[in-house]
């Protein structure tokens, strides 16, 4: 027989999952910032639409294969937002590096 959880138990479970999601999102964005640093050093643009399309295709395929309560389209929308925030963090880090380069050069 399946375990019946109370609302509070389910909310506690959700809180734990939320904390894990925040931790993983921060790790993901930290990786993106490092990729941005490497792209900056190589003189490459931060925004690379082909890579974004690749990530969203992979995410859509994963969401379809896992077939959870979220549709593949919903998962893609979530990841579009995650990617936007990662790109913003990359730009901010790049601007800080540029300011540091200017200050060091003076």
Residue ranges of each PLM-predicted region?
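Domain-level signature for soluble enzymes in the chorismate/prephenate branch of the shikimate pathway
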Residues: 1-106
């Amino acid at each position: 027989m399946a375990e019946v959880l109370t609302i509070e138990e389910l909310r506690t479970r959700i809180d734990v999952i939320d904390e894990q999601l925040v931790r993983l999102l921060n790790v993901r964005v930290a990786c993106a910032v490092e990729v941005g640093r490497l792209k900056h050093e190589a003189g490459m643009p931060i925004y690379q639409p082909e890579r974004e399309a690749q990530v969203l295709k992979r995410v859509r395929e994963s969401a379809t294969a896992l077939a959870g309560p979220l549709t593949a389209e919903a998962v893609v929308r979530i990841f579009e937002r995650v990617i936007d925030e990662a790109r913003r963090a990359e730009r901010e880090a790049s601007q800080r590096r540029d300011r540091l380069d200017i200050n060091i050069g003076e």
